[in-house]
Amino acid sequence: GAKHVILRYPDLYRRHQVAWGPYTNYITQDIRRIMNYRNWSKIVTNNPDGEYGHQHHKKTDELVTAVSHENAEHYDKLYYFEKFYTQDAIPEGLAKLPSDVAQKKHALIFKNYFDRGAIRMYEYFNDYENWVKATDWQ
């Protein structure tokens, strides 16, 4: 079975962000189908801030969170990506991921994400970005 699922909805078209408004119902149906496909141990998505404010990350969080609220078991398994910090604002003492987890994360990022510019721009935070249970998000 699948260890993870990454939806590939369009982000950019000819260097302009694609508006997801017309596709929201389709995206929601896909999220619902995936959540109900199997008994996932965790459901992990973008945080409500969209990490660094990306409109599609915010929308993804909104939709995944809304669908997870339809089933208490799903919501109990919902996690968000850690609060995002700029390179000069990482709090002192913010825990880094264990090295084996960080290595797996780096491999997953390079395998699944095509925006190499964004990968390079935010790479400094990869070793810190853990998951936060949705009920603990502040």
Segments (PLM) and residue ranges:
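Active-site beta-strand->loop->alpha-helix modules in alpha/beta enzyme cores, enriched
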Residues: 1-74
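The feature marks non-catalytic terminal segments
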Residues: 73-138
